[in-house]
């Protein structure tokens, strides 16, 4: 037995981990010699100038973005996290990693673990069971927007051939960036009167952007020549084909990405192979990852722009740029053109069409069950709760209990959260999604959705008008612990008697994050086959902070003994022992 298997055997559920290893073996046809990858991270605040404006950022070993985790399918990742933030807790979510057999290491504070308190050390240990492109990021308060994030790249096992060819593999991570601290942002969101976070000051590519220092206040430190904010440079060799992994970790912005003058072929989405299609611009929403192929086949005497622009909300942020450097041109040689500005930000049809185009690769289709056992319809609305502005689902705004759900469920702490069922639907026959709600008021709740283990569940996300007239927002929804089939998108109101007949049950893509377009609906289907408690929420940082999320429970009785390291908060203090 290899070191990774024996170590995983000690920390996780032996039967599930053995099943996972056997599954990897059977699906690849190869004996996977898994490895253990050890990482030692120190989480601390450092002064950083990613867009030339100096501010405090949450860093990993002094850097933001954090280090990229590279592994092969079946490997074990061990991350020793020391919280050196002094006055803040922390938790890290491994976005897109299903945590089969290790639900306690999902890294979701309040759902699967207590936070890592200041000065403490916590060890995450999990298997990366599928190849693809994934993320990690803070999952405590609004720390993600402060810089705690990075990439996870999982390669196929040696000898396995992917359904596309390329010469080199590169990665970029896209982000939006504010100069106000997360404390200032969170305080405004939780205040009366409500203070919105506003549009980001900059867009970052691999942690680099450019703020106009002439706009900085008199007490600000902003240096346009700081090397920390020099543009990221992607160097290419003429004639070669590149796989570019693109991940979005934005806290607010939906983005449109393009490589000036080059076509891109989409081949992967959230770790699943896509039926290839060619685009000039890629729409990418927070929490999504894609792989695209492009060939360096343009005029080699010049450099080109990598550019991203805000879509789906009126932009207040300049174009984010990096440089595509054709070797042997100097990497700092500026392109002779202006950066592309992308398609119109409010072209909803364009965004719908690209969402519809993402389908499973013909050789890698995993057909969904033809029917579901349960349908949950979630109306997304903005509301007031005791005068505070909140986001709600079926008129309930989510509140996180002090004791994590996984611990409460496993240890039968029934008083920790509301045991009444969460609302399954709303009055879809009479509710007008295009109008301001007649009643702005909602309630807060801690109820969860209890799913029969191994059942098939449909979730319909329904968008609607906000409190402000003629306004609806795009929401990227992320499901922890699972991939789901994307059965369809539509504009207007979902009708459960009509629209299921239009589902794509032939070749739907599987993803872990999906957009809900404004005044529209998105239908997903998943199997409740991963024992644990799993968050499902809008990936816009401020929206989840304001209550836009739910929790699914499935098969908790099948979860192994919980490690005491995840305990220590709320009613779990007594379970941890001396």
Language-model regions, residue ranges each:
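N-terminal secretory signal peptides that target proteins for export/translocation
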Residues: 1-9
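Membrane-interfacial loop-to-helix junctions in multi-pass inner-membrane proteins
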Residues: 9-13, 66, 161-169, 231
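Cleavable N-terminal signal peptides of Sec/SRP-targeted secreted and luminal proteins
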Residues: 11-31
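A eukaryote-biased signal for short, well-structured alpha-helical docking elements
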Residues: 24, 29-49, 181-187, 191-200, ...
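Extracytoplasmic/periplasmic copper-protein system
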Residues: 30-33, 147-174, 319-352, 503, ...
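Histidine- and aromatic-rich segments of cupredoxin/plastocyanin-like copper-binding domains
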Residues: 101-117, 173-174, 178-179, 189-373, ...
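Internal, well-ordered domain-core segments that constitute the primary functional module
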Residues: 131-133, 141-198
